[in-house]
């Protein structure tokens, strides 16, 4: 009888210990479930953050694509402006060559005019000298008259040459006026072309400044993409670590649940054994 009581006490103590262990296992299981739920919330938060970072990365890539498109358009505009500058330079060169030829023709016409003026002056001097010469020698009168006739003929010829020279001079002056007008027109065109060239130069400077700003924006976008990529990798690494932690916690929860089931089965076995013992004692 004493042995049975001792056995019952031992079984009761073992039962109490089993209940304590079961409660501890249940508490551990609850704690593990809480940790698992917290880890799952962290995983969901990380996944949401990853999605947000991916969206931001898409936006940055779209902005970069738009910046590249604008940069290509500006490069095309720069090439067009450079072509316009080259065309203007060719036009300026042609105008300068035309101006040089006009100046050369003007020099030639001026030289011819000076020669004609000198010839006319010489003829006029000879005519005046012959007209005002007074010769009293009758023997030389006939010769002088012949000379006078010749001089008159020469004077008339000189007059004709003078008229021709005057006519040519008028033509040369007209050509000179036209050349001066062309030169003035050329100078006006040169001024206009220089103004156009200055405007194109300013446009080129503006395009260069815009290109530098576009390059700076592109570098900033690339830097932002690198930062976003780094953040994405870090978030993915944290997500993987959290998933591994969740898996470990789930394994721990499974192990604790198995231990709890084992303790419950053990408790049930002890309870059945106690019931059987009480039944035996009662029958006894």
From Swiss-Prot:
Keyword vocabulary terms for this entry: Allergen, Coiled coil, Repeat
Coiled coil (UniProt feature): 1-284
InterPro entries xref list: Tropomyosin
SUPFAM superfamilies: Tropomyosin (SSF57997)
Gene3D superfamilies xrefs: 1.20.5.170, 1.20.5.340
Family: Belongs to the tropomyosin family.
Domain notes: The molecule is in a coiled coil structure that is formed by 2 polypeptide chains. The sequence exhibits a prominent seven-residues periodicity.
Subunit field text: Homodimer.
PANTHER family referenced in this protein's UniProt entry, alphabetically: TROPOMYOSIN (PTHR19269)
Protein task: Tropomyosin, in association with the troponin complex, plays a central role in the calcium dependent regulation of muscle contraction.
Name this polypeptide is given: Tropomyosin
Organism: Dermatophagoides pteronyssinus (European house dust mite)
